[in-house]
Amino acid sequence: GILLNPELNAAAAYVPHGFGLWRQRHYLILGLPLLQLLETRELAAVIAHEFGHFHGGHGRFAGWIYRLRSSWYRLMQGMAGGGMAGGQLFWLFFRWYAPYFDAYSLVLARRHEYAADEVAAAVAGADAAATALVRIELVSDWLQRGFWPDIHNSAHAQAYPPAQVHAQLSAALATQPFAPVALPQWLLEQEADPDDTHPTLAKRLAALGVGTDLQVQARGPASAAGSLLGDALVQQLEQRFSHE
């Protein structure tokens, strides 16, 4: 299935059966802001990357480990929240074993991220895969440092919640150029998060064969959201997400 949410993100989700050791149901989760940020070919690269996690051609064992990590994390979250049957015994076992499994499987999981990037490059081109990665990193930083702090400050300064937050975000994504002359040095010097399977941006660009002299041009007038969903549906989603 395909799900839309209000996040600047995309993910391949796995709903496990039998503790994630055999049958799984697959979901592709796409954030509306992501669709509004990217051009259609860049979005195709992102989707191909996520489908690459389902692909078994680049090392079936690494792919299975990647999916098993995702399944176990969701299982642990369900147990911790009391939303799944299983009892205290299962919860104690998973809480004890998960750190060991996480440490030993991280290298394989990161290798699978590179394999998924290869799928993205094969489908949409290495240039589209690279520019999508850079746009997402730049806008994620802008959201954390600029947009969301401004929204929170507005909420504290007025007696009512900010209205149409996601419409404001859509307008900002349409007007912000997010096209630096050169990649910021801080972006290239980011260190890997020990809890994240994704390699650093610099390593992912290098694996794609894209140099650090990459220049990301301003997005064209048509976003992937407008091209694929249509303006009317985008406005309905913005209103729904703003009310939630």
Give, region by region, the residue ranges found by the protein language model.
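Short linear motifs at secondary-structure transitions and domain/linker junctions
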Residues: 3-7, 21, 81-85, 171, ...
